[in-house]
């Protein structure tokens, strides 16, 4: 029991209510563990896997996962953390995005212990009367207790009525699924608590909630998001995942390891001690990047990614006289065009943009295709323009 509880709490931000979870575990029955994902984008990224990894831990402990695809709520758009109303997606867009979710999620979860559900199953049959009754369970004042709604209300920014429905529907999902535990990011706490309240209202035992930290993107500043371009998609090519992980700062590396690695706590502490004693952090980063690539693409692809990296950067492929440059970042990072100009690899930012468009720019061996890409503060990268221009750049 104690071991199971420690595994559940490992890496989590908050567990509510621990005593209730202990009582549920004492029953010895497999618990129903719920986590919902709105298919607002077609691909899952490493930020999503913080939750998926914890769900997998529950499976190892013998519990059943309810992976809820919010195809109905996806058409509303989660207002969490937004300072403006989010435009709803069409049914067609949500359905298309949901297709790839099921393929990707089983790279982490065991299909035999996973129940995939869609909240349109019950929400579309609820009807207008049912929706009004659901809305009547809570007040506007209660909704305004949510931090992002309160900020928008105080600054006189509009809050659409349908946005108040989102946490209610997410909470009602827990009623329909009879969830014992619900997982979510720290920014979802209000919505998760709504599930507890509604379960009590409908005469069910309230779910426990487990919040997980939000994973920063490769910029080390903002939450990982495809819209911000700071994400690492689990469907990306092995070399691309490996290269992106190798480009993050050393400080961010430890955050990623803590939230994403399956290595034991003792092994991770050993890495920390070795680095403190003088081991190059790059060695740890290689081991971690290999673990992540192997998880999503298999061990052979991971070994190949390491070999390709070593061939490029550790076996003399790079010039011995490559200049090393320290550059100051802007707002936590440095856009690639400016990095190339300041490193003396191009004549101007316009030239850099042309080189990127022509496929002639690489960072750590990976071709840059987005002129808006940035290198986060604290990262060291090998920048290459054409076949002969190189510089090892550290953004400070």
From Swiss-Prot:
One GO CC annotation: cytosol
Domain S4 RNA-binding: 334-395
InterPro entries hit by this protein: aa-tRNA-synth_I_CS, aa-tRNA-synth_Ic, Rossmann-like_a/b/a_fold, S4_RNA-bd, S4_RNA-bd_sf, Tyr-tRNA-ligase, Tyr-tRNA-ligase_bac-type, Tyr-tRNA-ligase_bac_2
A Pfam family: tRNA-synt_1b
Entry keyword set: Aminoacyl-tRNA synthetase, ATP-binding, Cytoplasm, Ligase, Nucleotide-binding, Protein biosynthesis, RNA-binding
Binding locations of ATP: 226
Signal peptide annotation: none
Places the protein is found: Cytoplasm
Protein EC: 6.1.1.1
Family per record: Belongs to the class-I aminoacyl-tRNA synthetase family. TyrS type 2 subfamily.
Function: Catalyzes the attachment of tyrosine to tRNA(Tyr) in a two-step reaction: tyrosine is first activated by ATP to form Tyr-AMP and then transferred to the acceptor end of tRNA(Tyr).
Assembly information from the UniProt record: Homodimer.
NCBIfam families membership: tyrS
Name of the protein this chain belongs to: Tyrosine--tRNA ligase
């Amino acid at each position: 029991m104690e071991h199971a509880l420690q595994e559940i709490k490992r890496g989590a931000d908050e567990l509510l209510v621990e005593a209730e979870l202990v009582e549920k575990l004492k029953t010895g029955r497999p618990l129903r563990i719920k986590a919902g994902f709105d298919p607002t984008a077609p691909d899952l990224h490493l930020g999503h896997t913080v939750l998926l990894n914890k769900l997998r831990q529950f499976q190892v402990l013998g519990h059943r996962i309810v992976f809820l695809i919010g195809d109905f709520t996806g058409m509303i758009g989660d207002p969490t953390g937004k300072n403006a109303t989010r435009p709803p997606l069409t049914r067609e867009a949500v359905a298309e995005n949901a297709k790839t979710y099921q393929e990707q999620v089983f790279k982490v979860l065991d299909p035999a212990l996973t129940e995939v559900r869609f909240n349109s199953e019950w929400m579309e049959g609820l009807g207008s009367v049912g929706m009004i009754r659901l809305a009547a369970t809570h007040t506007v004042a209660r909704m305004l207790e949510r931090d992002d709604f309160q900020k928008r209300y105080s600054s006189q920014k509009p809050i659409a009525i349908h946005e108040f429905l989102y946490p209610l529907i997410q909470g009602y999902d827990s009623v329909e699924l009879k969830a014992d535990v619900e997982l979510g990011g720290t920014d979802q706490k209000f919505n998760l608590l709504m599930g507890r309240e509604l379960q009590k209202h409908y005469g069910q035992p309230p779910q426990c909630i487990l919040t997980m930290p939000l994973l920063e993107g490769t910029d080390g500043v903002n939450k990982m998001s495809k819209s911000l371009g700071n994400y690492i998609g689990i469907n990306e090519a092995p070399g691309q995942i490996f290269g992106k992980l190798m480009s993050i700062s050393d400080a961010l590396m430890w955050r990623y390891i803590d939230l994403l690695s399956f290595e034991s706590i003792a092994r991770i502490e050993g890495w920390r001690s070795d680095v403190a004693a003088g081991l190059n952090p790059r060695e740890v980063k290689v081991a971690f990047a290999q673990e992540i690539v192997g998880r999503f693409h298999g061990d052979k692809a991971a070994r190949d990614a390491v070999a390709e990296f070593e061939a490029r950067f550790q076996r003399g492929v790079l010039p011995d006289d490559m200049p090393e440059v320290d550059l100051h970042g802007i707002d936590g990072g440095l856009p690639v065009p400016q990095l190339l100009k300041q490193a003396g690899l191009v004549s101007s930012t316009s030239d850099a943009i042309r080189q990127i468009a022509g496929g002639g720019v690489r960072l750590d061996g990976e071709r840059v295709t987005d002129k808006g890409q940035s290198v986060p503060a604290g990262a060291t990268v090998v920048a290459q323009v054409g076949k002969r221009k190189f510089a090892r750049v550290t953004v400070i």
